[in-house]
């Protein structure tokens, strides 16, 4: 998709990753069908591999993937709502060698965004689960062929705890907030709707829609 959009890609790294994916998929298929993961384990990039990639490219694109669905609920755990240790290591390693880093969030729902302040990528593109032509659409955005309007249909908080309605979900072992309902009722006394996010200020990564986040320069 990036090549079709006009980008020059690191073909050696693509070939290496394609080979890895084929081998990893064979291992996944050895598992019973009902126990198979939705994705394969990501290939580990060594510091030397990242440094070599920098010699071939001036922009790095990191894709973060999350899947969920029936029988596979989201969890407040590393590798789901939070970045995994491997993803943290990848972010840190890539930022060490690349000045320009773009993160694609190919995810089924919101996730923790506090890492944006830590690693400060050049851009973060939320593509959700975009479907068959999603890669082409993302490539057109990254190459500047279309305007990433940022007209969000949701409010993305930096942290789960910044969402007011989080007080009404689950029973927290970490002492944050115990479930406030009983066995028969869930109280929606507050925190429902995007208007509840307005007072939280810096806890919001981007506010709800109706504006563009693209900056323009004439000349």
What role is predicted for each listed range?
Residues 1-38, 106, 110-219:
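Secreted, periplasmic, or luminal enzymes acting at the cell surface/secretory milieu
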Residues 13, 17-119:
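Hydrophobic helix-and-loop "lid/oligomerization" segment in the mid-to-C-terminal part
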